[in-house]
Regions:
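Conserved SAM/AdoMet-binding glycine-rich loop
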Residues: 40, 113, 295-403, 408-444
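N-terminal [4Fe-4S]-dependent radical SAM core
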Residues: 8-38, 45-46, 203, 209, ...
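A glycine-rich phosphate-binding loop feature that marks nucleotide/adenosyl-phosphate handling sites
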Residues: 193-204, 311-316, 340-346, 409, ...
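Short secondary-structure boundary/capping segments
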Residues: 54-56, 86, 122, 156-161, ...
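Iron-sulfur (Fe-S) cluster-binding segments and ferredoxin-like electron-carrier domains
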Residues: 273-289
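Glycine-rich beta-alpha loop elements in corrinoid/cobalamin-binding modules
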Residues: 74-220, 456-507, 514-521
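N-terminal pre-triad scaffold of radical SAM enzymes
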Residues: 39-43, 61, 248-274, 298, ...
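Conserved small/polar residues in nucleotide/adenosyl-binding loops
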Residues: 526
Length: 527
């Protein structure tokens, strides 16, 4: 395989995606390893290496004695074609061994439209797609991530799911597997043992029955497994594992910077937001711990930017203390500090003025809806006055770029709400004219609308999704009311959002459609 591998690298785009060898990748001696895990991200290297969850769990598993976790990413179409043409199986970046050589194969599920990539990666690894076709204790396939809160569309393919946060459950899973391997247990015996770990769902132990109209009637567990699976959470973020020595990519990735997770959960409760509900309760790290982790990460990686990651960064209670500590380190070294997920109702000009000394970036806000009535309906607790006041403060401080994110198709939305988006944009433009301190540069407003996708375990999980035709009508209605040259409007395509809703809320029968699409050659999630 090695000779073929090197030859095909010269025929594909961005070969650095496939070779590994990055600074801080973890290499172990196979003689010292008794459990090998192939950690698969069902998307490209550039996206997967930007994922903080994957970096955390990669470190968690490799901290365990006798365990070697290696990375696997979905190949781009040109590489997949070469692999199929030459019979080259999917490999890991660290050892370049075939994925089929590994004890356990883990997938992280962060986006429903990557489900087809899970099947494609298993096929490229020359591993049977269906769980029932995989015998023995080798090639155990499990999955976690936010999409695992509804595991049913992938239930026929995945041996078990880890629901909730993975730092603690992952180590328990691997220790359970290590014990089963030493005892020579069968796959079924291992699955019965792992099902006793909190947060673990083994689909084959639950029988689904349906009514005559096709709706779900009941889910019956086998004896000895929980009727309901309780999600796992990390109780103490200050002591939770965080990788300060992370892999430095060999090629440019989507988010090419250090990421500092400041807290999990969200106090806001927006009714459409799955992460806001699934990652409750709020758990924060202290500013002292965060400063220490940030400095260690920056010194090790050499990155020129660090981002404070959370669902709502400006809600962090020690934000100014943390920012002051980080800026004392970052400013003299010309390292940019980025604060995404800011809210218009608690924007601090003084804080932002200091943060922007290294590099002034644009403002980003997500009002989500164009009128106060609809913002109240979705529990987006921000007023038009707060949005305009924040923009006035920022414009007077020298900002001249604003990104605005909205959704179309939210429950109870009317044409008045759609037109309200354009009206809010023009009010922001008027605020710029009255308060902008750098008018020679002009104002740039980047406006984006997404097609509302109802997600499980949110208050809107049962809401209907508008048709693609109605979505496009609302897009065109908004476009017809946007005339300012400074506004760049972009909208999501409707077809993918419709499929996303099906995958997000579907049951096991969706898996049959996934399998059929795979057999017909669907590859749109990557390409």
């Amino acid at each position: 395989m090695t000779d073929q591998f090197h030859r095909i690298l010269m025929r594909v785009q961005k070969p650095a995606r496939y070779v590994g060898g990055e600074y801080n990748q973890i290499i172990k001696d196979k003689k010292d390893v008794d459990v090998r895990v192939a950690f698969c991200f069902p998307d490209t290297y550039e996206i997967g290496m930007s994922n903080i969850g994957m970096r955390i769990l990669y470190g968690v598993m490799n901290e365990m004695p006798g365990v070697w976790c290696e990375r696997v990413f979905a190949p781009w179409g040109d590489m997949e074609d070469e692999m199929r043409a030459h019979g080259i199986p999917l490999w890991t970046l660290e050892s370049h061994d075939a994925v089929s050589d590994f004890d356990m194969i883990a997938f992280t599920l962060g986006y429903e439209m990557c489900y087809s990539n899970v099947l494609n990666m298993l096929e490229l690894a020359q591993i049977p797609l269906l769980s029932k076709d995989r015998d023995g204790l080798e090639n155990i396939v499990f999955a976690g991530g936010v999409c695992a809160v509804n595991p049913e569309p992938l239930a026929d393919f995945i041996d078990f799911f880890s629901v909730g946060e993975g730092e603690d459950s992952t180590t328990e899973i691997i220790e359970c597997y290590r014990s089963a391997k030493k005892q020579g247990l069968t796959k079924q015996e291992f699955l019965h043992k792992v099902a006793k770990i909190e947060g673990i769902y083994v689909p084959s132990f639950y029988t689904h029955t349906y009514r005559a109209d096709g709706t779900l009637a009941a889910i019956a567990p086998e004896p000895g497994v929980p009727e309901r699976v309780k999600k796992r959470i990390v109780q103490d973020m200050n002591t939770a594992y965080f990788p300060t020595k992370t892999i430095v990519p060999s090629t440019q990735i989507v988010h090419d910077r250090s990421n500092l997770e400041i807290f999990r959960g969200c106090i806001r409760g927006c009714r459409f937001c799955q992460a806001g509900f699934c990652y409750r309760p709020i758990r924060a790290k202290s500013a002292d711990v965060l400063c220490k982790q940030a400095i260690e990460s920056l010194e090790d990686s050499g990155n020129s930017e660090i981002t404070l990651a959370s669902l709502s960064t400006s809600d962090y209670r020690e934000l100014e203390t943390l920012a002051d500590g980080l800026l004392d380190y970052c400013e003299p070294r010309k390292i940019n500090l980025s604060l995404p997920s800011l809210r218009a109702d608690n924007f601090s000009r003084e804080l932002m003025m200091r943060i922007q000394k290294v590099r002034k970036s644009g403002l980003t806000f997500a009002p989500e809806a164009g009128t106060q009535r609809l913002r109240d309906a979705i529990n987006k607790n921000v007023t038009e006055e707060e949005i305009l006041s924040t923009c006035a403060t920022a414009f007077s401080g020298g900002w001249n770029s604003v990104k605005l994110y909205f959704m179309l198709g939210l429950p109870t939305e009317t044409d008045e709400d759609v037109v309200g988006i354009a009206e809010l944009v023009y009010k922001i433009l008027q605020v710029w004219r009255e308060n902008g301190s750098g008018k020679k540069r002009g104002l740039s407003i980047n406006l984006a609308t997404a097609y509302f996708v109802p997600k499980p375990f949110t208050p809107f999980q049962w809401a209907a999704q508008i048709t693609p035709e109605e979505y496009l009508r609302r897009v065109h209605l908004l476009q017809a009311n946007l005339h300012a040259k400074c506004v760049d409007y972009r909208y999501h395509e409707s077809d993918l959002s419709r499929l996303e809703a099906v995958m997000a809320r579907g049951d096991r029968r969706v898996g049959q459609a996934l399998l059929e699409a795979h057999r017909l050659g669907d590859r749109k999630s990557v390409v």
